[in-house]
UniProtKB/Swiss-Prot annotation:
Binding site for 5-phospho-alpha-D-ribose 1-diphosphate: E114, D115, V116, I117, T118, T119, G120, G121, S122
Protein name in UniProt: Orotate phosphoribosyltransferase
Pfam families xrefs: Pribosyltran
Catalytic activity from the UniProt record: orotidine 5'-phosphate + diphosphate = orotate + 5-phospho-alpha-D-ribose 1-diphosphate
Residues annotated for orotate binding in this entry: T118, R146
Top-level division of the source organism's lineage: Bacteria
Subunit and interaction comment: Homodimer.
Length: 191
């Protein structure tokens, strides 16, 4: 898939939003990628996740893990394409962990996936969970990298779409200065 095909999917599904948004990272932005708008369409989910899977097909991936919520469908579909199992992490008392009797074997080769990264914070937490359980992270795959490649996760990272989107600290946000209310379209609570 080329960049234009990927952008076309995000545009057709209404997944690229403009306005004033509070991101999961706590930062503010004038653009938001609502990947759920894409992921509700199995034909697009399959196509995008197959492309991610192709980028890691020779890495010996044994398990794919994504953080709840956005990474669950991506993890499942990438794992299906690779013919391996899919797990997801969840927050428990504010800390990312594997629950539901999910486990990893020491040395298990894991691909971490996510729908969108801005700072890479959630993915970094998943990487730490994998390492703490003795797993080996072979890479990270994301649908959209809003950091324009600046999120350094310490492992090979593949993004289907890498974009540069303005982000602002809440204390220095021109959209707030204009009196525009910030909307929190994602699912994780900001503390």
């Amino acid at each position: 898939m080329n960049r234009e095909e990927i952008i076309d999917i995000f545009t057709k599904t209404g997944a690229m939003l403009s306005g004033h948004f509070r991101l999961t990272s706590g930062k503010h932005s004038n653009r938001y990628f609502q990947c759920a708008q894409v992921l509700q369409h199995p034909q697009y989910t399959q196509k995008l996740c197959q492309e991610l899977a192709n980028r890691f097909e020779n890495q010996g991936v044994q398990t794919v893990i994504g953080p709840a919520m956005g990474g669950i469908l991506v993890s499942y579909e990438v794992a299906r394409s690779l013919g391996v199992r899919s797990l997801f992490t969840e927050r428990e008392n504010g800390k990312m962990s594997l629950r539901r009797s999910f486990s990893l074997q020491p040395g298990e080769k894991v691909l971490v996936v996510e729908d969108v990264i801005t700072t890479g914070g959630s993915v970094a937490e998943v990487i730490e969970v994998v390492k703490s359980l003795g797993g080996e992270v072979v890479g990270v795959g994301v649908l959209v990298d809003r950091s324009n490649g600046k999120a350094n996760l310490g492992v090979r990272t593949e993004a289907l779409l890498t974009v540069s989107v303005e982000t602002y600290d809440p204390d220095n946000c021109p959209l707030c200065d204009q009196g525009l209310p910030a909307v929190k379209p994602g699912s994780r609570q900001i503390t």
